[in-house]
Amino acid sequence: MTNTETAVFGMGCFWSAEELFRKINGVISTEVGFMGGNIKNPTYGQVCRGRSGHIEVVNIIYNPKILKYDDLLELFWNNHDPTTPNRQGWDVGEQYSSHIFYFTEEQKLLAEKSFEKIQKNSELKIVTAIRKASDFFPAEEYHQKYFMKKNNCILNF
């Protein structure tokens, strides 16, 4: 596929993150999985037990002619709490920490600029990590498009 770019964010439970991004015009596909850990092909169980060092992430393939990386960053910042280490709501553990994984120097610079803007406007310390993307490991199939499959679930973004 040509003319696409990839963005990866960790912002708590990957089910909610995927549901948010998959509906955005310009997003071609989303997939949930794990990034940033120290073992190959981790299972959900290994990640949840804190044995792998991975973060739950949403992998987003998008068309940069329709959707800008800055727009994705804005959705990232506005739809989770970047001030709580290793936690999002009721979900607690390092796998739920706030992360931006970048693929290019441009993404890194845009992420850092957005981080500074958010920090400037926040009374609390922003704990989001900005890290170079590493291997992405897809989560098990039952995690993919979870809320879409469970069409009786209601999410408010």
Swiss-Prot record:
A single cellular component GO annotation: cytoplasm
EC number: 1.8.4.11
Reaction(s) the record says it catalyses: L-methionyl-[protein] + [thioredoxin]-disulfide + H2O = L-methionyl-(S)-S-oxide-[protein] + [thioredoxin]-dithiol; [thioredoxin]-disulfide + L-methionine + H2O = L-methionine (S)-S-oxide + [thioredoxin]-dithiol
Pfam families in UniProt: PMSR
Biological process annotations from GO: cellular response to oxidative stress; protein modification process
InterPro entries: Met_Sox_Rdtase_MsrA_dom (IPR002569), Met_Sox_Rdtase_MsrA_sf (IPR036509), MsrA_MetSO_reductase (IPR050162)
Record-annotated active site: 13
Gene Ontology molecular-function annotations: L-methionine-(S)-S-oxide reductase activity; peptide-methionine (S)-S-oxide reductase activity
Keywords: Oxidoreductase
Family to which the UniProt record says this protein belongs: Belongs to the MsrA Met sulfoxide reductase family.
Entry-linked PANTHER family: MITOCHONDRIAL PEPTIDE METHIONINE SULFOXIDE REDUCTASE
Described purpose of this protein according to its UniProt entry: Has an important function as a repair enzyme for proteins that have been inactivated by oxidation. Catalyzes the reversible oxidation-reduction of methionine sulfoxide in proteins to methionine.
Record-given protein name: Peptide methionine sulfoxide reductase MsrA
Origin species: Methanococcus maripaludis (strain C6 / ATCC BAA-1332)
